Amino acid sequence: MIREEEVFKIGQFAKPHGIKGELSLVTNSDVLEDAEDPYIVCEMDGILVPFFVEDFRYKTDTVVLVKLEDVNSEEDARMFVGKEVFYPLDAVDEEDLVGDMTWDSFIGYTVTDVQKGYLGEITDVDETTINVLLRVDHKGEELLIPAVEELITEADHEARSLTVSLPEGLIDL
């Protein structure tokens, strides 16, 4: 059985494409490109289920048309609409992982500062500003942390945690 900590979110299925079972996957990830036998994972009835990717092609920079094995009609594809799409951590080299993940993938991660210690859990990501911000529940208050790789000293995807080195005074704002 696949566990939640063994996968990370790469996107979401939007809608069927055509009548042969293809689906539009909205994603910023390119993990399927490097996979020899790619498969994705979706939650179905509360269980994480793997689905083998028969074929895929890019429609735009952020939309990939995906054909899953045994999904052969528009009707079959409709059951995937709106489903979040995950990818197995063990199928990606650890050093490549951060670059392939979207910031939304970090929701639910814990955040620890190298000086201040445990800060809280990432509850949301704000992409409405020029700089992407991680929203962290810090002792019942919202802490906004710029989502820049220079501040992140370690990302442990299996433990779902980030270690950051924040500038002096940022936590006090």
From Swiss-Prot:
GO biological process: ribosomal small subunit biogenesis; rRNA processing
Keywords: Chaperone, Cytoplasm, Ribosome biogenesis, rRNA processing
Membrane spanning residue stretches: none
Lineage top rank: taxon: Bacteria
Pfam family, one: RimM
Main location: cytoplasm
Span of domain PRC barrel: 98-170
UniProt-listed SUPFAM superfamilies: PRC-barrel domain (SSF50346), Translation proteins (SSF50447)
Assigned GO CC terms: cytoplasm; ribosome
Single GO term (MF): ribosome binding
Cell compartments where the protein resides: Cytoplasm
Domain free text: The PRC barrel domain binds ribosomal protein uS19.
Homology family: Belongs to the RimM family.
Functional description taken from the UniProt entry: An accessory protein needed during the final step in the assembly of 30S ribosomal subunit, possibly for assembly of the head region. Essential for efficient processing of 16S rRNA. May be needed both before and after RbfA during the maturation of 16S rRNA. It has affinity for free ribosomal 30S subunits but not for 70S ribosomes.
Subunit and partners: Binds ribosomal protein uS19.
Protein name: Ribosome maturation factor RimM
Species per Swiss-Prot/TrEMBL record: Parabacteroides distasonis (strain ATCC 8503 / DSM 20701 / CIP 104284 / JCM 5825 / NCTC 11152)
